[in-house]
């Protein structure tokens, strides 16, 4: 029993030291990539991967008390990744949490305050490739479709979701785990499925 308690204490100390180390690395990464960031940003288990195209030519703003968890119990064994293209705008509000989430921003993604995003979720404001096969073959990057995403305050997005280009998720709404969101969701509603559909009002 004593050994077990000692092991738990040691493990907790290691985790605490590790979290502070990875938080420091993330602060350094944000500083050198011209990210505007607030206070008390928390990183657990591994610092997020931050990829800012062309030496910080996009715009990233991260608010206060934002938490990034990578490789945690509910992270789908994923690391948090933030990828922002040239001239794109990513804004993350206060008191928001991400668990093994990938954000890819080519135009504009806005995440409000008090938002929770579950493990393995992907947020893409772009199709990544042209829809037309001939344009894909010729790698016509200018033909790729993209549109802004807005996730309003107090939204909860379950694990393993895909949030696709051009959608707005209204305040206090819930997206069920494993959903693919292809159209906008009004406030105070639960949606789920592939593609996500209305389930009930809150």
What does each of the following model-derived ranges do?
Residues 3, 111, 117-202:
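Glycine-rich hexapeptide-repeat left-handed beta-helix
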């Amino acid at each position: 029993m004593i050994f077990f308690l000692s092991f738990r204490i040691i493990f907790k100390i290691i985790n605490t030291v590790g979290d502070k180390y990875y938080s420091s690395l993330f602060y350094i990464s944000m500083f050198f990539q011209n990210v505007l960031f607030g206070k008390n940003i928390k990183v657990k288990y591994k610092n997020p991967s931050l990829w800012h195209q062309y030496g910080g030519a996009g715009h990233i703003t991260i608010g206060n008390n934002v938490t990034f968890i990578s490789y945690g119990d509910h992270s789908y064994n994923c690391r948090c990744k933030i990828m922002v293209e040239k001239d794109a705008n990513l804004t993350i509000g206060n008191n928001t949490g991400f668990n093994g989430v990938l954000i890819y921003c080519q135009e504009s993604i806005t995440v409000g305050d008090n938002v929770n995003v579950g493990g393995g979720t992907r947020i893409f404001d772009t199709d990544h490739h042209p829809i037309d096969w001939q344009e894909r073959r010729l790698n016509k990057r200018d033909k790729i479709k993209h549109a802004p995403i807005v996730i309003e305050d107090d939204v909860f997005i379950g694990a393993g979701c895909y949030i696709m280009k051009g959608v707005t998720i209204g305040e206090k709404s819930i997206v069920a785990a494993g959903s693919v969101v292809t159209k906008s969701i009004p406030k105070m509603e639960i949606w789920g499925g592939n593609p996500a559909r209305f389930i009930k009002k809150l």
